[in-house]
Structure formats: C-alpha cells, structure tokens
Amino acid sequence: PAELYTKIVTRRRGGRCMENNIFLGTALRSLGYEVRNCGGRVSRAMSPYPEVRKNQSATYDGWNHMLLLALLDNEWYGVDVGMGSMGPNLPFPLKDGFETLSIAPREIRIQRRSISETHATDPSHGTKMWCYDVCYNPAEGEKTWTPVYCFTETEFLPQDYEVMSWFTSTNPRSFFTRYITCTKMIMDEDKEVIIGNLTLFKDTVRETIGSDRKVVKKFETEEERIRGW
C-alpha cells in the first residue's frame, strides 16, 4: 500500500486493476468497511482485436481482473475502479437483473447466469457467475447488452493476484504487454458527476463525452506521447 500511495496519490500515475483496487480496498478497510478481494474474467467482447470481438464475443479470458465486494448496510456491493472507461462509476448491488445509468447515456446491468463456455449439457446447470454488462445507447430501440466481465464472490488472496499479475504483465498474449493505454475521467463543472473520459490507446487520444467521441491528439514519437499525456 505504501508504494501504491506514492504511485497513485503522490505521482498521480494510476495503475492496473490490481493496483487501483488493492489501494482502494485498503482505504475502505481503514474506514471500517468489510471488503472482500475478488477476481473476474474480462469478456472478449472488450478485446482490442476486431477478429476476436467478431468471433469470440460470447467468451471470456481467464482470471485476469480484480474487483472488490464491500458490505454496506448488510448488503454486498461490487466496487471497481480498475476497468477504465468501461468500468462501473458507482458501487452496484449484487442483485440479479439490476440496471442503472452509468456515465450517460450508457447503462449497466448485473445478471446472475451461466457463461456460454460451461460444459454443462444443460446451461441452466452450469456454474452461475455474476456478469457485468453495458448498453452503450439505450435510447436506440431495443437495448443491446455487451458483456464486460464476469466474477464470483470467492475471496482471492495475494498469492492469487501474484499469479494473475505475472501473466498479465509478462505474457506476450496479454493486452498489457502489447499496448499502451491510459484513461482519465472527465467530471462536470461541479466535480460531482463523471460525464466522459480521455483515453490514450497506442498513439491516439480520444475524448468521449456522452455519445460523442472524437480524436483529440495523435502522437508520432514515444517522446511526444510521454510529454503530451
């Protein structure tokens, strides 16, 4: 936690899901909350590769994401500050079918369901996962939901994250060893509501506010990218 404090608070650098959520979990526990560290599988519908999104969008990666469960008024809530622009921007109750507005106009929902990769002959007999989905434009006719990640209520230990972190930070197939990315949230004038984000991916910075998305900067060199971001 001390190293994370220096990186996140002092140097204002942020981090991956395991860094951000470990730091937040430590802060919440220091305030007296009951917090459980958990793990998730990111949906391949979130893949940066178009062919993967097209052909494997109904499947998930292995355990590669961290989130928290916090007990509030005897009810468990999911808390996650490590999924970038697609993550929830508020705690969500573990209630099957829960839906709410996230960063407008986007909506999020939570479902308790089996994922498509279960080996159960009857999908209803498969292990149920909590599934976090997003709907980008709910006003455009029937809602289309895109899976973001699935997770369980099983407590993950530091040694579990050691394995997860080793893979995500060293394996050549990992997103984090192939791409540079960073996200900053954009607040409204009162600094109360998140209205969008600035996201650097590879050499391009894009700004998203509401349903409007535009390229605001494109870097030509690594030095330019470091200075500009």
Question: What would you call each of these model-derived segments?
Answer:
Residues 12-41, 68, 182:
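Cysteine-centered nucleophilic/redox motifs
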Residues 209-229:
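A conserved C-terminal secondary-structure "cap"
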